[in-house]
Design a protein with these regions (language model features):
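Cofactor-binding beta-sheet edge motifs in enzyme active sites
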Residues: 1-41, 45-48, 54-263
Length: 263
C-alpha cells in the first residue's frame, strides 16, 4: 500500500482515485474471474463517510497550528481459503454438547469461534458447549492460521449441528410428539426445539430414545467454485493523523473501516 501511495504521488494523482482507476477486472495472479469484487465500493463508501474530499493533495499543506494533518487510505484483500474438514458432535441427555476436531488453537480464538457456532446453530447457551481440539484421534480438520480455520472447521461443525437438528426432528416425529412434518420452520433455542406450538427440550427427546447421547458427523469440501473463481473478502481503511512539527508526536485522530466480508 505505501508503494501504491508513492506511485500515485509521482503520477500526480490522488491515492484514492489512483486505486480506483487501476482496479483489476480479474485476478492478476491467476487470470481467474473474481467470485465477487467489492473493493471499489468499499473505497467509495469509505471516502464519502470519511470526508476524503477535504484532503489537501500536497504533503504538509494541511495544518492546525503546530499540528501537521495527513489523510491516508489503504485497501484490504483477504483470500478465501477453504480446506476439507470434518467434525463430530455429541449431544448428551443432560443437554450438553461436545464437539471434536483435530485442529489446534494457536491463539486464533478457535475454541471461542467453534463454541459460538455450535451454540448458535443448536440453540444452546455457550456454557453448555464443550470443544475438544488437538488430538489425532479426532476427525481430521483444517489447520489454524489466519481465518481459514474458522471457515473450514467452522463450516464442518455447522454441518454436524444441522444434522443433529434433523435427528431431533425425526425423533419427535417418530414419537408422535409433533403432529406436522418437520420443516425448516422449526426453531432451536435455550436447549429446546420449537415446532409450531410444541416446545420440547433436548433432554426430553433423548429420554424418548432411551439413549444417553446422540452423535452426528459433519464435513465440508471445497466445491467447483473454489477452483474456478478467485475468492476474497475486501475492505478499505481511512485514517486522519496529526504530527507535531516540533516534537514529532503522532496522534491518530480518526480511523474508519468499510468491509465486504460476505454473509
Amino acid at each position: 500500500e505505501p508503494a501504491i501511495d508513492e506511485m500515485a504521488y509521482r503520477c500526480g494523482q490522488d491515492p484514492l482515485a489512483f486505486r480506483l482507476a487501476n482496479m483489476p477486472d480479474k485476478d492478476p495472479g491467476t487470470g481467474q474471474p473474481f467470485a465477487s469484487h467489492d473493493l471499489a465500493d468499499c473505497l467509495r463508501e469509505g471516502a464519502e463517510k470519511f470526508g476524503w474530499q477535504n484532503r489537501e493533495a500536497k504533503p504538509g499543506s494541511q495544518n492546525r497550528g503546530r499540528q501537521l494533518i495527513g489523510y491516508g487510505v489503504a485497501s484490504t484483500i483477504r483470500i478465501n481459503i477453504l480446506q476439507p474438514s470434518k467434525t463430530r458432535i455429541r449431544l448428551s441427555a443432560a443437554g450438553t454438547l461436545t464437539a471434536w476436531a483435530d485442529m489446534t488453537d494457536i491463539g486464533t480464538g478457535t475454541y471461542t469461534i467453534l463454541t459460538q457456532i455450535a451454540a448458535e446453530t443448536m440453540g444452546l447457551p455457550a456454557g453448555r458447549v464443550h470443544i475438544e481440539l488437538g488430538d489425532s484421534r479426532f476427525p481430521q480438520s483444517s489447520g489454524s492460521g489466519g481465518s481459514f480455520g474458522a471457515a473450514s472447521s467452522g463450516s464442518a461443525l455447522q454441518d454436524a449441528c444441522e444434522r443433529m437438528r434433523t435427528k431431533l426432528l425425526e425423533i419427535a416425529t417418530e414419537q408422535g410428539l409433533i403432529s406436522e412434518e418437520p420443516t425448516e420452520n422449526a426453531r432451536f433455542g435455550d436447549g429446546r426445539m420449537i415446532v409450531g406450538d410444541t416446545s420440547l427440550s433436548f433432554t426430553e427427546l433423548l429420554h424418548k430414545t432411551g439413549e444417553a447421547y446422540l452423535e452426528a458427523d459433519g464435513e465440508v469440501e471445497p466445491g467447483d467454485d473454489h477452483d474456478n473463481y478467485s475468492q476474497h473478502s475486501y475492505g478499505a481503511q481511512f485514517a486522519e493523523v496529526h504530527v507535531d512539527r516540533d516534537t514529532g508526536e503522532v496522534r491518530v485522530q480518526r480511523l474508519l473501516g468499510v468491509f465486504s466480508a460476505g454473509r
